Amino acid sequence: SRRDEVIAEVVQRDINTLLDDRGVGPSTDGVHRQSVVSAISTLFGASLLNSAYDFTGRHAIDPTGLMYMFTQAVTSPKKPAKAPQPLKNAEPYKFPTTHDDVRDALIAASEYVIARSGIHRATVSRIARRAGVSVGAIYGLYENKDSLVSDCLEVLFPPQSKRDADDWSRVFTAPDQRAVVTDILANYMSPSYQQWRRFRLESIIAARHSPAIASQLSAYAAQSRETILRASTKAPRSAPVGETTGLSARASVLGLSILEIVDPTICTLDWRWVPIGRDYVVSGHAQ
């Protein structure tokens, strides 16, 4: 699409040049790059989520605590506690079936098309071609494109949102929070999740312009937030990832999906260097 051409020819080049000038671009690696990637991703993700969803009061994502940790990591990097090793308990992306072959085909095709062109430019005819069915078959199940998109969101978002929330809930009581976050990021940024990452990103972008989509996704986000919030109460007082930083970590993960578009090399980062640790916490609380 034209948008992707502009990203590749202009935006990606400019961002990579800027990062290279700071010594943290695609041609470099290490703790500094990891910290900058984390900081940029957090800002990108928080900006998008806060603009797409109807957050009010303390429900808005405040990335201050995470940004403090990432800034400290640049000046006082902490080596990973474990050596490189194969990812444990890696789970590839699982497409949730509806047990209806035609519906599954249409939702899978919608995910594919939306991930590549966005919701507003995804056409019923293109989705039908991808699914291998006629346009009439779509209108036999759905009133219009909006109802197909709504069903697609309803099938795909809740199970993945639940899994994400459950994964992050484990972080709060983990003896080594950094190791758990490392596994989460390594799994999420794996090739298996690439299409889901793009689909999720395009859906949230569409929510900025569609009240119906925003309302639907906000409901899923609220459920995930409550799960994470309950789990965060069990975090030790001195833990680097507590209520504030744990909730705002949702923005970091989404932001990686944004940064990945302009710098695909971040998918190969050594996530053991993710800047999380007690050394970056002040007075027992992330500031």
Segments from the language model and where they lie:
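N-terminal positioning helix adjacent to the helix-turn-helix/winged-helix DNA-binding module
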Residues: 35, 102-109, 123, 196
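Helix-turn-helix
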Residues: 113-151
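Hydrophobic alpha-helical connector segments
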Residues: 39, 164-197
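An amphipathic alpha-helix adjacent to DNA-recognition modules
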Residues: 103-108, 120-121, 141-165
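Short, structured motif recognition centered on aromatic/hydrophobic residues
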Residues: 1-2, 39-40, 149, 160, ...
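Extended intrinsically disordered, low-complexity coil regions enriched in Ser, Thr, Gly, Ala
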Residues: 7-30, 219-226
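Hydrophobic/aromatic-rich alpha-helical bundle segments in the mid-to-C-terminal region
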Residues: 8, 26-87, 214, 218, ...
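Amphipathic alpha-helical segments used for helix-helix packing
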Residues: 1-8, 12, 190-214
